[in-house]
Amino acid sequence: MAAFPRFRFLAIAVIFHFAYIFSIFDIYFVSPIETGMRLFNVQRPPNRSAPADRLVLFVGDGLRADKALQSHPEPYPKSDADLTPRPLAPYLRSKILEQGTFGVSHTRVPTESRPGHVALIAGLYEDVSAVTTGWKLNPVNFDSLFNRSRHTWSWGSPDILPMFEQGAVPGRVDAYTYGHEFEDFSSDATQLDLWVFDHVKDFFAEARRNKTLAEALRQDKIVFFLHLLGLDTTGHSYRPYSKEYLNNIKIVDQGVKEVAELFRDFYRDGRTAFVFTADHGMSDWGSHGDGHPDNTRTPLIVWGSGVAKPQLYPGEVAPGHDEYSADWNLDHVRRHDVAQADVAALMSYLVGVEFPANSVGELPLSYLAADIKEKAEASLVNVQGILEQYRVKEEKKKATELKYRPYQPFGENGLSPERRVAEIRQLIDAGRYEEAIEESAALMKVGLGGLRYLQTYDWLFLRALITIGYLGWIAYALTTVVDLHVLHGRVRPSRTLGGGLFFTSVLVALYASLVISKSPLTYYVYAFFPVFFWEEVYAHRESLAAGRKELLGHINSGGSVASFVLNSALYVGVIESLALGYIHREILSVLFVLGSFWPFTHGLSFLKKHGALSATWFLACIAMSTFTLLPAMKAENVNLITIGGVLMVVIGLLYLIFEDFVLADFSWNAKPTSRNHLSRSLVGIQVGLTVLSIIITRSSALSLQAKQGLPRGNQIMGWVTLVASLLMPLAYRLRPNNHYMHRILVIFLTCAPTFVILTISYEGLFYLVFSALLVSWVRLEHAVQKFTSSKAPQTAATKKPTTTTESHLPAPFRPLTLHDARVALFFFILLQSAFFSTGNVASVSSFSLDSVYRLIPIFDPFSQGAMLILKLMIPFALISANLGILNKRLGVAPSALFMVVMGISDILTLYFFWVVKDEGSWLEIGSTISHFVIASLLCVFVSALEPVSAAFIAGVEVGEESELKEEGKVAEKVVEKVNEAVEGLVSGGDGGGDES
């Protein structure tokens, strides 16, 4: 495809996949925020006030519901009695048993701090992409409880408080924060919570002296927000089952008790409502973000003015309990679960302010100490806020649609929202409060359904467009492969006037509909790619026909047809099994076990000739199969880190000892080559850097485990070792050794120190086994090609091309054949394994931050995330280098196999696109998002790996190249001698003539 050479194909691949990754956010996770709504609150007579004059919100960041309410031994026992399990939050527990109402607040994905706080305080669920905005100052630019309050005072983290302070009415919210340097994962995080409690005490001490402040604190409709980050930081550092985390719960409970008593002593009016909850939970491996139940279940304890007393069921199990709360010893107290956004509605009601404009929370009536009439009024106001959002959204949708399809329950056959609200008002006026509450609850569900209907209004059109786009990419990629790497550009594209008019008309029609609908700019991108891809495929239809003859021309008998169909079904089955492997990691183990027998399919003669190589492949596959059987959620294991690092050092030392054997393709018969002493010295330095990384990592890990912090010297040396090791390949340019095995070792040792520093358990062993598997794969594929080519006569499809004026490729590159599909499939499986063998496929959050603390102990999500990405990229770097060498050994173009994989990989992407969920269990939602994003990014990685591969193998020589060069030199000398002899004869003949 002369018009679209290789580098343009790669650029198109990257742009297309990045654009289409965001399609799930335009389809499934559109921001629900709207403006222009009227606000509603419960109207009361002048002589009646709100349930509470003030509200105190405690958010224990990262606190799991079970850990808060279970019984545990004393974290730091001083006597045998301390070993007896007891509640670690006795004050909060007393509120559950005596004064308030409790339950579990269920969060949504992503289970991160910003989305969690937005749901709690604004009552809405931001779209999933908003999680990244929580890592930088990005004001919450929509309505919230704080914005509705008369005034809000807040204390806590600089990552959370400024968002609400700067997003509210100027001067409405005061935020008191500690510095970012306090968020040190290597220090005692309880100091963060103690800082908050101490500053609240100082604040009220100042109020006793400051008359202006005291008057402000005596107003109604005020809110106090205490953000307690210590639990989250401790959970990340030590895990939520650790004594440090449990001790932090004790400190939080004591702090809440002291603050509650402070309010009681200061106000002495009993008009304060207290809410204690969390923004998200924490997984057993110290992370959050996905939809695992440990991350989505948080405690909710409410007590004080306007709050219902506990409902007790002595001697029996109270309603609301299940297996999850069986060990809390609270079975006799009714448990009232809520969705996280419901908390915002509850707090708004208690303090007597309007419900936030975009709130979708349902007011939990079971938490209210109100009579039935008050509950009926509150329910109606709650549903009016939802219906107001529906009205505004519907008006905007009508304005951009040629033919609007109304929501059926509110359509021609259903009652309008206004009519149904009027009916509920009549029920309240008639004193039929129970019926009014039931009707409000039913209308609430219909209203939320209407909001969802409008949210998903464009789904069918967009999903069809994206699907056609992905199918177009697959067809375009495979067409490009056939044109470039099978036909070598011999067939020119054939465009017709009719075809051009057709595709242009389709694009114009799509864009016209998008303009009328006032669609976002991203929609135009989604519409462009399908038309572009399918037009390219149509223009190269003759290439496809010629490619079919080249690739399938030899399939002309019943047996060959059956073999082709069977192999095709097998390959499709493997790809489908990889989709299941995203959920069940064990499937990758099965694939490796099956793949270990691949050399046996070539017969005994092949095994006899390549016995050692086949055995290496078999053992490497079996070893690789074990990693996906190990738990993805792993704790730090310094001994395993050390063992992995030592084995990396052993590999480097063995190479230095047996260099001649390795460079002779593992043969003892070859003559020893001249030693490149500079190159060997550099290998020794790389081995030394790996040893240094082991020492530093072990020291840093033990220091952090002992809670002694990260020594400054260790941090500096860790960075020096990491950077120096990554720069070492530049030194080899002084006197390069271009043998492919030497190049592979250099890359292996380049990444080894980084992998040691950033590993927490068995990942170092994976790095070793994975590297061994890749090397044996490169050698085995070459051996198979030589073996099969020596047995089978060459056909037109297998001959190496000669240089012709028609070919767009240089002579060394042979055309692809059907047999290369297996090589591409192996490459694809190895890509999946590179990511999944050490991580939980369903949860990106399973990649622990423990290793990053050895370099960056202070909370810095972008830098820490970059370190994790660097670690994840190392196996991909190994694959790219080995595949580049394999391309050379097989004689195919550098981009050929990359492009094949880029085409077939989106079969997985398209599958995961259709199974993305935005409702259901939070685990399902988070998993489907992760699956789609990972599958999409893998294709982007492949497109990026080709230039990486080219850089890694620049100038590298495989065995055949060296032999050809030597043969070429001999041939040149022979030709020179022949020419000299001929010239001598000619000149001799001429001289004789003259003399005569």
From Swiss-Prot:
UniProt keyword annotations, A-Z: Cell wall biogenesis/degradation, Endoplasmic reticulum, Glycoprotein, GPI-anchor biosynthesis, Membrane, Transferase, Transmembrane, Transmembrane helix
Cystine pairs: none
Origin species: Neurospora crassa (strain ATCC 24698 / 74-OR23-1A / CBS 708.71 / DSM 1257 / FGSC 987)
GO CC, any one term: endoplasmic reticulum membrane
Residues of this chain annotated as glycosylated in UniProt: 47, 147, 210
Family the entry assigns: Belongs to the PIGG/PIGN/PIGO family. PIGN subfamily.
Lumenal side: 30-463, 517-518, 582-586, 634-637, 703-715, 776-822, 887-895, 954-996
Taxonomy, superkingdom: Eukaryota
GO molecular function, one term: mannose-ethanolamine phosphotransferase activity
Protein name as catalogued: GPI ethanolamine phosphate transferase 1
Protein topology in the membrane: Multi-pass membrane protein
Gene Ontology BP term (one): GPI anchor biosynthetic process
CDD domains: GPI_EPT_1
Primary localisation category: endoplasmic reticulum
InterPro entries named in the record: Alkaline_phosphatase_core_sf, GPI_EtnP_transferase_1, GPI_EtnP_transferase_1_C, PIGN_N, Sulfatase_N
Enzyme Commission designation: 2.-.-.-
Chain segments annotated as transmembrane: 9-29, 464-484, 496-516, 519-539, 561-581, 587-607, 613-633, 638-658, 682-702, 716-734, 755-775, 823-843, 866-886, 896-916, 933-953
General function of this protein: Ethanolamine phosphate transferase involved in glycosylphosphatidylinositol-anchor biosynthesis. Transfers ethanolamine phosphate to the first alpha-1,4-linked mannose of the glycosylphosphatidylinositol precursor of GPI-anchor.
Pathway(s) served: Glycolipid biosynthesis; glycosylphosphatidylinositol-anchor biosynthesis
Entries under PANTHER family matching the protein: GPI ETHANOLAMINE PHOSPHATE TRANSFERASE 1, PHOSPHATIDYLINOSITOL GLYCAN, CLASS N
Compartments, as annotated in UniProt: Endoplasmic reticulum membrane
